[in-house]
Amino acid sequence: MVAPGRMVTSSRRIGRVTNKTKLIIYRGSDKVDTSAAETVLWDQEAGGAGKDSNKHQHIGATGVESGELLEHHLQAALSSASLLHSSNKPSSPKSVKEAPAAALNYHIPTPDATGLVSDTVFSQLYQRTKYVEPYNFIRFSDTVEESSCGWGGLGYCMDDADERWLNDFNSKAEGSSGDVKSDKEQGRGMRVKGKDREKEKGDAPAPLVISEDMFEYIMGVFEKYTEENAPMLHTDLSLLPPFSAVENMFSTPISPAFLPSNEIPKELGDLKACARMARNVYPHWKSRREQRQGKSILPQLNYDETNDNDPYVCFRRRDIRATRKTRRTDNFSIEQFQKLQFELRSAHALADRVLTREREKKSLYEAEKELWEARWKFFETKRRWPSLGMTSDEEHKITGRPTIVPPIQIPSLSGQTPLTSGQSSSHMRKRTDKDREERAQRERYDAQRNAERSGILSGRSNAPDALKERLQALQQKTEEMLARKKEQDAHWDDSIDSPYQPLPPSNSVHAFRSLFVLDPCRAQCKDSETGNEILHPESFRIRRGRGGIVRLDRRTSIYSHRRGIQPTSPSEYPTWLFPDIAPRRSEKKRPRSIDEVEEEMQEQSPKVMRKDLNETWRYDVDRGGAVGVGMGLEEDYDRVIIDDLEAKYIRHRISLLQESDCAKLRPDNYILDQTREALDAAADAKPPPAPIFQKPPAPQPNPQLLAAHLQQQQMLAQQQQMEQFQRFQLMAQQQAMAQAQAQAQAQAQAQAQAQAQAQVQAQGQGHPQAHLQTHPQGVPQPNGVNSPMPNGQQMLPPSDGVKQLKLPPHAVARLGAAMANANANANGGLHVLQQQQQQHAQTSQQ
């Protein structure tokens, strides 16, 4: 309540009451007129306090939130309080008469705070000594629920019903343990031996007493197991787990992951006793669950906020706090934190990389150590067994120093006939293999001599005889395999010796024509300046460009010359060996004047320029293919480039041609001769001898068997025709017999009628016209016999529903013949039958 000076009236309104508004507080000893005081309400007008004017708009005029105005008990309490307040107001401020006290019809129960507490009770509840928190007070961040949990972090807390059941169970267990009487109390005891006494003492069960902590642990395990395995138990009580499903949680060690604290309580003790306790507690837990209709025994808080009108929702969100706008200070602090985070991450990444580098160094040192130890063991083995020998590769593995490669040496070609590329490569390969074999034999011989010398000096051999024999056998086997391999590869070229395979020239290269073709005399010409032989003469090509323009392409000449003596360095050998393809002065597009200063040519030495140009154009296919030893030119890929000016080659050109030289210029008819010989040999060849084992000839068909087979087939066909004819004949006979029987019956009836007419005529001849009038015409009889008509014609017999068969022409002919025979037979039989009937009639008349 506020002072009278701050009272809110209808004519004067005060400012909005907030947490910063200063209010006068009245104590119990102050005299305050409660009837004159008024309740201060929240100011909801828009012009209240600026930016906070809309902060408490959800507070109603009664001081209650708008969401709680729908609760009926709160509305009843507010209306009752307003009625009580209006009834207690005096009629006028000056009246002293007190109104009768009215009781609240409905109120919200709250603790009574109107009375005074006695000094004795106050001194017991509130001590005068002030509590001082110790310095070593233990602080932790666990919540109240976590702190009040039982064993294993299970949050089950026993209530009054559990306490009553536990007290009854413990009292019964303690009472039952004292009810067992001894043999002396029951009467004269039996004499029992010492072992039996110990057995009886062991058989007596110990009293089962369950502590409160143990009871809460067992109930908590039941609740957690049911919550995980039967969450919908409140919908169907049949899902309640039996004790057999939960018994393993007590008879065997429980998993720490099952408990909320992830720790097994140390106070459990014996598992057998724990299982017995759980077996006794299970019926009580089951009954409690059934009473709760499958719900948890301990009531759970309702956190479901889907229904806003539910008053039992816990921790309901009253209002949504508006997010504050970001300020500059906040941005600055965020940037500082981000910068600090980036620096820490960079430092961590750098440290991680340093650690990785050191680990790699450690692994590298360990690998080098292992390699050094392996080399040392290998060296010790070689030193201990000298007979094994030492190759260049093994020496390189031990010392780690590469073997010095000797300078390249080309063997001199002797003889009168120049070698081709195939002969040269095979000769080089054989020479290399021979040198390798000689070197290996020499090393083995030296190793054997050293071993013998060391054995003679020491008096005994270092290597056992068995090991020597084994090594010799292995070496011999290896040599045999190498020799066999060499024989198999005698007619093959190893690509390892010349691994470079030049690309085939393009079609445009073949279109060039050299000057040798145009002017054969120019083929013997040499360079006028140097006198070198021309390897690749000038060539031209005519092609047609765009717009029909005819263009002439040319290629300069390539000369072969070797400058100086044969070099010994491998780096200088290609320059001396390969042909020079640098252009000459005569190959320029236009001649230079004598007075022109060649400053740009003096900047770089001609030797370096020539070397660079040769290396650049050596493998150019368009230029003329790969040129060099073993690589060939575009005209002849099997040609070896050599120095034509050498004395051993030039002597073949300066001398006159011999008969053998002319024979070499003629075309080789070797292939034609071989073909002719093969044809002659095939014509004169003898027939091949008969093989020992021949495939038996196919059996010839027997004409008699074929004739018998054909005759059998004809007989089968005739038999089938006869069977078909007999079947048709049988059908015709059946039809003829049926017709004959019908005709016989008709004739018998006709004779009977004739006899009856004769008798009538004999009895009375006065009525000759009666019979004629009754049958003036020949009427067909019921039996189907045709009666004669006055004109002498006969009527066709009715079909009587018989279906007519559609037969082929040959069958119709055969059937007609059969019908004729049947009719003849039937007529003969009918004639005989008529004669018999006439004889019978004559005998009857007589």
Swiss-Prot record:
Pfam families noted in UniProt: EPL1
Keywords: Cell cycle, Coiled coil, DNA damage, DNA repair, Nucleus, Transcription, Transcription regulation
Residue segments, region Disordered: 169-204, 391-466, 587-607, 682-702, 759-804
Biased composition (Basic and acidic residues): 180-203, 432-452
Coiled coil: 434-490
Complexes and interactors: Component of the NuA4 histone acetyltransferase complex.
Record PANTHER family: ENHANCER OF POLYCOMB
UniProt-recorded name of the protein: Enhancer of polycomb-like protein 1
Protein source organism: Cryptococcus neoformans var. neoformans serotype D (strain JEC21 / ATCC MYA-565) (Filobasidiella neoformans)
